[in-house]
């Protein structure tokens, strides 16, 4: 992914504008990671942020959607969620308040910015990263999208764009294999 922006894409995203979004969200991290840091995504990149450009905090709109993301991470590491969670992980409950996000929850919204379902659910992140980069460039605070795992929504909050108090850590608990199974079943 190049650091260059596609001007046409920037204009299409700017024309869509943002919505204010508030929700209780969930995120899992390694036990010693900061729940409200997007540094890992900055270093390695994520679906909605290219590597080495800006930090992004990935949040699921339900505990079940978060557990699907745990499954996806385990599959990418060629293991099971239960085996992966034998290491120390934490599940964080985070309150999101009035985050100005690019809403890509409808097929029409995604089409308007040049994304297809394969971009959302597939393994090639380049289209999503280009959209995320443009949204960040426009000082949007994040993007709201269907979760790649097919359950719920994900909001990617751009850490440098959020204001104090917009992301509030409510609770952190150990994410054990037993808790994973309980939450995945709901």
Curated annotation (Swiss-Prot):
Q: Which UniProt keywords apply?
A: NAD, Nucleotidyltransferase, Toxin-antitoxin system, Transferase
What terms describe the molecular function in GO for this protein?
A: nucleotidyltransferase activity
Xref: InterPro entries: RES_dom (IPR014914)
* Entry EC no(s): 2.4.2.-
Disulphides? none
Swapping residue 47 to A leads to an effect described as: No longer toxic
Pfam families documented for this protein = RES (PF08808)
Q: State if Translocase is listed as a keyword.
A: no
Recorded phenotype for the gene knockout or disruption: Not essential, it can be deleted. Deletion of the mbcT-mbcA operon has no visible phenotype.
Q: Report the biotech usage.
A: Molecules that disrupt the MbcT-MbcA complex could be candidates for anti-tuberculosis therapy.
The text of the family note is:
Belongs to the MbcT/ParT/Res family.
| Its job | Toxic component of a type II toxin-antitoxin (TA) system. Neutralized by cognate antitoxin MbcA. Degrades NAD(+) by phosphorolysis. Expression in the absence of its cognate antitoxin MbcA causes dramatic reduction of intracellular NAD(+) levels and is deleterious to cell growth, causing cell death. In a SCID mouse infection model, mice infected with bacteria overexpressing this protein survive longer. Overexpression of this protein in a mouse infection model at 21 days leads to bacterial death, and shows a synergistic 100-fold increase in mouse survival when combined with isoniazid treatment.
The UniProt subunit note reads as follows: Heterotetramer with 2 subunits each of MbcT and MbcA; the tetramers further assemble into trimers with 3-fold symmetry. The antitoxin acts by blocking acces to the toxin active site.
Q: What is this protein called?
A: NAD(+) phosphorylase MbcT
Q: Which organism is it from?
A: Mycobacterium tuberculosis (strain ATCC 25618 / H37Rv)
Q: What is the lineage of its organism?
A: Bacteria, Bacillati, Actinomycetota, Actinomycetes, Mycobacteriales
């Amino acid at each position: 992914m190049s650091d260059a922006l596609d001007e046409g894409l920037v204009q299409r995203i700017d024309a869509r504008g943002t919505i204010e979004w508030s929700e209780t969200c969930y995120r899992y991290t390694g036990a010693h990671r900061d729940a409200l840091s997007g540094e890992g995504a900055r270093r390695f990149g994520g679906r909605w942020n290219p590597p080495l450009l800006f930090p992004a905090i990935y949040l699921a709109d339900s505990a079940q959607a978060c557990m699907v993301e745990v499954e996806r991470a385990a599959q990418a590491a060629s293991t099971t969620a239960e085996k992966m969670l034998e290491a120390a992980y934490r599940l964080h409950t985070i309150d999101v308040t009035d985050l100005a996000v690019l809403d890509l929850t409808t097929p029409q919204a995604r089409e308007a910015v040049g994304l297809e379902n394969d971009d959302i659910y597939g393994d090639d992140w380049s289209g999503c990263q280009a959209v995320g980069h443009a949204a960040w460039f426009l000082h949007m605070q994040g993007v709201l999208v269907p979760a790649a795992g097919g359950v719920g929504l994900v909001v990617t909050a751009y850490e440098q764009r959020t204001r104090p108090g917009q992301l509030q850590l409510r609770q952190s608990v150990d994410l054990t294999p037993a808790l994973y199974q309980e939450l995945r079943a709901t």
